[in-house]
Regions:
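Conserved C-terminal "lid"/linker of ANL adenylate-forming enzymes
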Residues: 33, 37-38, 49-50, 70-132
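AMP-binding/adenylate-forming catalytic core of the ANL superfamily
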Residues: 1-77
Length: 134
């Protein structure tokens, strides 16, 4: 399973645990609170994503943490990594209690598809409403 967890971006091989360890060095993040994986973007390129369980509710502090993590990953690994903050106890785990990167990836993709569907529905509704107004 470890080989398929490997993140390959622009020919660079990055182990997800290296990204996760970098995040876990931050005072707000506990060991086991980060899960890194890659997804294929709309143009077919790989994109690194890190889901991080965050106990912070203050939006300014959350934004600061997101920016700090993004900067650290960029500085350390030279890649653009999307940082997704999620509520605590929401990262999927295996039956033995370990983080499930594939489970986190599936949840992320499911949420993105749901958001895109919502945006599409709102867009269709808005354009239909405009047509009626004309």
């Amino acid at each position: 399973g470890r080989e398929k967890d490997l993140i390959i971006i622009s020919g660079r091989n990055i182990w997800p645990q290296d990204l996760e360890n970098l995040a876990e060095q931050q005072p707000e993040i506990r060991t086991g609170d980060a899960s890194a994986f890659s997804v294929t973007g709309p143009e077919g390129q790989e994109r690194a994503v890190m889901m991080v369980q965050c106990r912070q509710s203050d939006e300014q502090k959350r934004a600061g943490l997101r920016e700090r993590l993004h900067g650290l990953v960029s500085e350390e690994f030279g890649i653009d990594c999307l940082i997704e903050l999620v509520p605590r106890n929401t990262l999927p785990r295996t039956t033995s209690g370990k983080l499930s990167r594939s489970g986190a990836r599936k949840e992320y993709l499911k949420r993105i598809k749901a958001e895109q569907a919502t945006e599409l529905n709102e867009s269709l509704y808005t354009s239909a409403f405009r047509q009626q107004a004309i």
